[in-house]
C-alpha cells in the first residue's frame, strides 16, 4: 500500500514539474513575441514625439521636468537589444533638439528609457531645462566615459593623458648601455701582459750594462731587432716573452750598445703562451727585477706605476680569466 502511494506521488510530482516547465516556456515565448511586436510601434511613436517637440529656444520658461520611465525587457534577447540601442542612438543624435542646440549629451541612449512629452505646469516654478537634463542623466547613471555609443566629438572633448610622451626619451640610451655591459662581460681569449724597467728620475740606463744584464737573464737577440726569452736559455724552443726599448721604434743595435742609453725597457708576454702562463709570468717578473737591480732601475707595471702586491694579483687574475675563457671553448 505504501509503495503504491509513493509511486503515485512520484508520478504526480513529475507531471507537475513538466507542466511548470511547459508553462514557463510558453510564457517566455509570449513575452518575447510581444516585445518584438511592440518595438516598431514604440519607435514610430518616439520619432513623432521628437518631431513634434519645439526647439529649446522656443519653449517657455515654465517647462516642467523631463521624466524618464524605465521599461524592463526580457534578458533573453541581447543581440536584438544591441541592434535597437545602436539604431536609437543614431536617431537621437540626428533629431534631438537638445543636441542640435549644443546643450550636452542625449538624455538617454539606452533602449530601456522611454521619454514622455513635457508637461506644462503653471502653478509650480520650473527648473531650467539644462539643469533638468543634467540631473536626469545623473539619475540614470549613464556616464559619458562608459557609454561606447556616444558621438565621437563628445568623447574627444574629454581630457586625455598621453603616457608615452616621456618614456622613449628616457629609454633612448638603454641599447648603447646594454651593449657596453655585454661587451664588458665577454671574457677575453687572449691578452698581453707588460712590465717596465725604468731608470730613476733624471737618469738613464747604460747600454753596456743593460746588454750584459739582458744576456745573463737568458735573452737572445732576434726578430724585429729586439731580445727574446726562449724556453731554453740557449735560444731554442718557443718564445716565452720579449724585451724591447721603451723609446720608439723600440729596437736595439747590439753593436752600438756601448754608446746607447735609454730611459727604460719594456717586457711583454702573450697569454695564452707555451707551457704554464703563470710560471712564464713569474719568470718574466724575476728577469725584470734582476735587470732593474743590475742597471739601477725600478720595476713598473703596465701603467708605469710602482709595482704593488695588488697589481700582481691583478695580473694573475687576468691570466686566470683568459685561461678559463679558452678552456670553455
Swiss-Prot record:
Membrane topology, as annotated: Single-pass type I membrane protein
GO biological process, one term: division septum assembly
Location of the region described as Disordered in the Swiss-Prot/TrEMBL record: 45-183
Subcellular location: Cell inner membrane
Biased composition (Low complexity): 149-180
CDD domains: ZipA
Segments on the Cytoplasmic side according to the record's topology features: 28-329
Assigned GO CC terms: cell division site; plasma membrane
Ranges annotated as biased composition (Acidic residues): 136-148
Comp. bias regions, Basic and acidic residues: 45-78
UniProt cross-references to Pfam families, sorted A to Z: ZipA_C (PF04354)
Main location: membrane
Function, in words: Essential cell division protein that stabilizes the FtsZ protofilaments by cross-linking them and that serves as a cytoplasmic membrane anchor for the Z ring. Also required for the recruitment to the septal ring of downstream cell division proteins.
Subunit details: Interacts with FtsZ via their C-terminal domains.
HAMAP family in the record: ZipA
The protein's name in its UniProt record: Cell division protein ZipA
Amino acid at each position: 500500500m505504501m509503495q503504491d502511494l509513493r509511486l503515485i506521488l512520484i508520478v504526480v510530482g513529475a507531471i507537475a514539474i513538466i507542466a511548470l516547465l511547459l508553462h514557463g516556456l510558453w510564457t517566455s515565448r509570449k513575452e518575447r513575441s510581444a516585445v518584438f511586436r511592440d518595438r516598431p510601434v514604440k519607435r514610430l511613436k518616439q520619432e513623432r514625439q521628437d518631431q513634434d517637440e519645439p526647439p529649446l529656444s522656443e519653449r517657455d520658461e515654465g517647462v516642467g521636468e523631463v521624466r524618464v520611465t524605465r521599461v524592463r525587457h526580457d534578458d533573453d534577447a541581447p543581440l536584438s537589444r544591441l541592434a535597437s540601442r545602436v539604431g536609437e542612438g543614431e536617431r537621437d543624435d540626428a533629431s534631438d533638439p537638445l543636441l542640435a542646440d549644443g546643450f550636452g549629451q542625449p538624455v538617454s541612449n539606452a533602449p530601456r528609457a522611454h521619454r514622455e512629452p513635457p508637461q506644462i505646469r503653471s502653478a509650480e516654478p520650473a527648473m531650467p531645462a539644462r539643469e533638468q537634463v543634467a540631473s536626469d542623466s545623473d539619475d540614470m547613471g549613464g556616464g559619458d566615459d562608459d557609454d561606447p555609443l556616444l558621438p565621437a566629438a563628445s568623447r574627444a572633448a574629454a581630457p586625455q593623458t598621453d603616457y608615452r610622451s616621456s618614456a622613449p626619451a628616457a629609454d633612448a640610451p638603454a641599447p648603447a648601455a646594454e651593449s657596453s655591459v655585454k661587451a664588458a662581460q665577454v671574457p677575453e681569449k687572449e691578452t698581453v701582459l707588460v712590465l717596465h724597467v725604468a731608470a730613476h728620475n733624471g737618469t738613464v740606463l747604460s747600454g753596456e750594462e743593460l746588454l750584459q744584464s739582458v744576456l745573463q737573464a737568458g735573452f737572445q737577440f732576434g726578430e724585429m731587432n729586439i731580445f727574446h726569452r726562449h724556453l731554453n736559455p740557449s735560444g731554442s724552443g718557443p718564445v716565452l716573452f720579449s724585451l724591447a726599448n721603451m723609446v720608439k721604434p723600440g729596437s736595439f743595435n747590439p753593436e752600438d750598445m756601448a754608446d746607447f742609453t735609454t730611459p727604460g725597457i719594456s717586457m711583454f708576454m702573450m697569454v695564452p703562451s707555451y707551457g704554464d702562463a703563470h710560471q712564464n709570468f713569474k719568470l718574466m717578473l724575476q728577469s725584470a727585477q734582476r735587470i732593474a737591480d743590475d742597471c739601477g732601475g725600478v720595476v713598473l707595471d703596465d701603467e708605469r706605476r710602482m709595482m704593488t702586491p695588488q697589481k700582481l694579483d691583478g695580473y694573475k687574475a687576468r691570466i686566470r680569466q683568459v685561461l678559463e675563457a679558452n678552456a670553455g671553448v
